[in-house]
């Protein structure tokens, strides 16, 4: 099939809409269930590229959770700790497959943003992963294949209308890509940059030591940024993105936004949060919302009289600013990638507050010396890649 008619484009008034192959060849995808829309396909094709590259770079199954053409999370399939399984709401599922662990991590990093996501999987979707997907609010999934049991499970979602796309992994797009804006066609070579160890070899700080685990995390960060709307910054720890700042005009606002998300991810692991006693009737999304408010500055919105009773069996104690800072100080060895250079050392100062120890960025600012000096002050190791990773 050379083309697929869609209900509408980005918005309901944008008709007609379709996806098609300009060269007349068949589309490299097959819709197994549902009727994906314009934005669904944008998320699916960007997400597929991301997980395909993560798998190639790490040798591990990979997953990403996309919203509005940027990843909310991305991860590889490392086993979950007991704490992570609990904060990702999968502690009742027993031991998960590596692919399911990858999606639990990708979805769990920023659960508020991942609500209603589009999922991309690097490997054939198995039953464990399908069970996890089934219980979450999601728009669809793309993968190179699905086991029979996985399809049976996904068919139970949205009364059989959940969007399930199979992509042919052998498909290789043309070297030149095009897009139109205001009737004008833009053409460029595809971004085929290989994110590898050599790209991270130019370490410009006094600290030259980047351990293997951090190198993997830096590659995850840069590959994630390659498919994130610019400007973008990505914090990674333990094989998963823990905070992604996307689409900001200011670099430091990217760093702050992603840093706050990384902080929230770590705060969810604090005893004060793990000990929250939710009402049995409260669903996962409502619990996520309650936690987000509880660990933020507006905590009274869920702790006020008449409000806490709607969410908790027992009124929680206030998680004070001092307690949160003390807990966050335990988050160490975080990696950070940036899709363009840091123009000022304020980015490094903010990154330090979220436990960053290893950094990868292109370099090339007139103030590189000040940025390096700030890294040296904190004993950070920073690599200059020499390559910008803008994505629009």
Where are these regions (language model features)?
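Substrate-contacting helices/loops that form the catalytic groove of nucleic-acid
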Residues: 175-210, 268-293
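Glycine-rich phosphate/pyrophosphate-binding loops
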Residues: 61-62, 67-72, 76-78, 232, ...
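Conserved helix-loop functional segments at active or binding sites
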Residues: 53, 227, 264-268, 353, ...
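C-terminal binding/interaction regions
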Residues: 117, 121-122, 135-165, 170-172, ...
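Active-site loops and adjacent core secondary-structure elements that bind or stabilize anionic groups
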Residues: 1-199, 214-232
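Glycine- and Gly-Pro-enriched alpha-helical subdomains that act as flexible
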Residues: 72-112, 242-341
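Active-site-proximal loop/turn and secondary-structure-junction residues that shape catalytic pockets
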Residues: 70, 125, 237-240, 248, ...
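Flexible, glycine/charged-enriched surface loops at secondary-structure junctions
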Residues: 57-65, 164-167, 230-237, 267-278, ...
